């Protein structure tokens, strides 16, 4: 039968069907927030970085998006689980420290959005089909 999951933001929705369990999150790349404060509060808490001064908004959005996809994969709660997820850019891996969950993820940048998929498979997903209702 497969698994169906979805994510939405103010002007887009993503639906994903896959044979295995999968999580997805979408957010706008122009989202307005203080990315440094956000990163200090929610991310990099396990490996405090000396290079927080060059963290870009895009880097934080990608991390946020991947972690949200992992939380959705686990059917977790954002407020409860966000501090337990570790994000690794290379290899593209997400680890829940408390539950010892290891996931892989893929990032897709599409027009004004960044999209992340979280899954157990070892191979990365290729975005084979993206359907839009607008011409870009």
Regions from the PLM with identified roles:
Residues 1-136:
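Conserved nucleotide-ligand handling architecture
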